[in-house]
Amino acid sequence: MILPNAKAIIGFGFAVPKGLYKAMENGNQFYTYTTLGVKYIDEEMAEIFLLKMGGMIEDEGYDACLQKAIPNLKIKGDKTTNPEVVDTYELIHAEAVEEGKPVPDVIIDFGKAAFSCGLGEWGLNGKIINKEYGPFMRYCFIITDMPLETDNELKDAVCDKCGECIKACPGNAIDKNGLDSWQCSVYYKGAHKSNPFITDEFLKDNPERDAILNGEKRFDCESAREIYKELSFLPNTQWGYSPCLCGRRCDIACFKHLKGEM
């Protein structure tokens, strides 16, 4: 356990402005979503918020173990990736300090935490879906020994497996079983024909060019990392976030379905 004497986990959600998604949907602006909708919320707003909230809890004599997104690390045994960053690192060399204890670095499952807090649940598209904001949210948490009156876990499913996200993905990275994160990472970074920054020079000597652009090529860990070298349409941000060039179409389709717009 991260905090052995913990009594509660407190969840916080930050809404990403819908206008950032609309700008991508219209094909007018992509970089602002990556900077303001992902990086600044997770790396600055959430951090400051957690430190302030944690300070308030500890001023009352309790412990506050702050939990923010750790975008580029994967616990030992987790072979997935995070499409939002340049690459991820699995903690393959980590070992528990003694038998029966978890292998560090312990990273909480945000989807399970959000579910426990009544905030949302994992959807088919690999994002946490909230009843009000859909996937247009970022999250952070505090584990504490403060005795609190807690909310109930979610009782009703938020994701109804409608499949709109499956149809929307330009890289065919989602199916009825969920998200293929390595496939997603390639097309999130722009290897699809609807990427407005692609030129005729892109992969011009690659015999699989058409299959890649049409989302027909399947990528795994090795092949995805190999093609990353070609996906430099916009600069990566500070903290290593990759520009979102798929327009988060899966999220937009999910939100529209949730609101009865499709």
Model-derived segments and spans:
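Non-catalytic, usually N-terminal nucleic-acid engagement modules in DNA/RNA processing proteins
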Residues: 1-51
